[in-house]
Amino acid sequence: MTIYLTELDSTLYFPSPEEALTEPNGLLAIGGDLSPARLLTAYYNGIFPWFSPYQPILWWSPDPRGVLPVAQLHISRSLRKTLNKTSLRFTVNHAFMDVVTACAAPRRYSEDTWITSEFMQSYAVLHEMGQAHSVEVWDNDQLVGGLYGLSVGKLFCGESMFHRQTDASKLALVALCRHLSRYDAPLIDCQMQNSYLETMGVQEWPRAEFLRQLAQLREQSFPAECWQPQVLTL
């Protein structure tokens, strides 16, 4: 079967997410680059890059979309017990590139990573611009878990997470949700559903509904103190 995709050029143009393929679900465009400007344009329009090593850059907007309503975060009984007795510390924007680097490391189930050096360089710039943020989990001075993503107005677009201790990435997500709730941020974009995220309360929304929410939230903004480096109390 022949697949027709828009090939991106040097402009920042993206086709409408509604033009994405149904198979593979959400594939919208190919090519372009991972410059900070293009990444921002993509995320502000409900599009994200995802590709394997040695593939061209692929851009996606799946239907349905994986989203986590912050108020509906699910904390299992076992995770709640861990949370109640933990001595771990949680911070925002204390070690952004360390988190990105940890997320880019090979996983047990795969040696591949889509977090390329170009992607990491662009995210470093986005962090300096105040657009990209991280949550860190610390055991004393050791970074044992975390996540990072991009703020699009009052929508947080999660990119990746990691853990070096059991449940550390889940605890990072709990910390993020509680932090966002203090600033009335209602939604985290998780891109695509999976069994791990489903246990945390991630839902599948029709793309059209996600795009409606995105259109509203991208016009709002966090106060500056939201993303200042800080220690989080859970």
UniProtKB/Swiss-Prot annotation:
Record key words, sorted: Acyltransferase, Cytoplasm, Transferase
GO cellular component labels: cytoplasm
InterPro entries from the UniProt entry: Acyl_CoA_acyltransferase, Leu/Phe-tRNA_Trfase, Leu/Phe-tRNA_Trfase_C, Leu/Phe-tRNA_Trfase_N
SUPFAM superfamilies according to UniProt: Acyl-CoA N-acyltransferases (Nat)
Gene3D superfamilies membership: Leucyl/phenylalanyl-tRNA-protein transferase, C-terminal domain (3.40.630.70), Leucyl/phenylalanyl-tRNA-protein transferase, N-terminal domain (3.30.70.3550)
UniProt lineage: Bacteria, Pseudomonadati, Pseudomonadota, Gammaproteobacteria, Aeromonadales
Enzyme Commission number(s) of this protein: 2.3.2.6
Major enzyme class: transferase
HAMAP family assigned to the protein according to its UniProt record, in alphabetical order: Leu_Phe_trans
Residues of the signal peptide: none
Family: Belongs to the L/F-transferase family.
An individual GO BP term: protein catabolic process
Compartments where located: Cytoplasm
Record's catalysed reaction(s): N-terminal L-lysyl-[protein] + L-leucyl-tRNA(Leu) = N-terminal L-leucyl-L-lysyl-[protein] + tRNA(Leu) + H(+); N-terminal L-arginyl-[protein] + L-leucyl-tRNA(Leu) = N-terminal L-leucyl-L-arginyl-[protein] + tRNA(Leu) + H(+); L-phenylalanyl-tRNA(Phe) + an N-terminal L-alpha-aminoacyl-[protein] = an N-terminal L-phenylalanyl-L-alpha-aminoacyl-[protein] + tRNA(Phe)
The protein, known as: Leucyl/phenylalanyl-tRNA--protein transferase
Task performed by this protein: Functions in the N-end rule pathway of protein degradation where it conjugates Leu, Phe and, less efficiently, Met from aminoacyl-tRNAs to the N-termini of proteins containing an N-terminal arginine or lysine.
Pfam family, one: Leu_Phe_trans
GO terms, molecular function: leucyl-tRNA--protein transferase activity
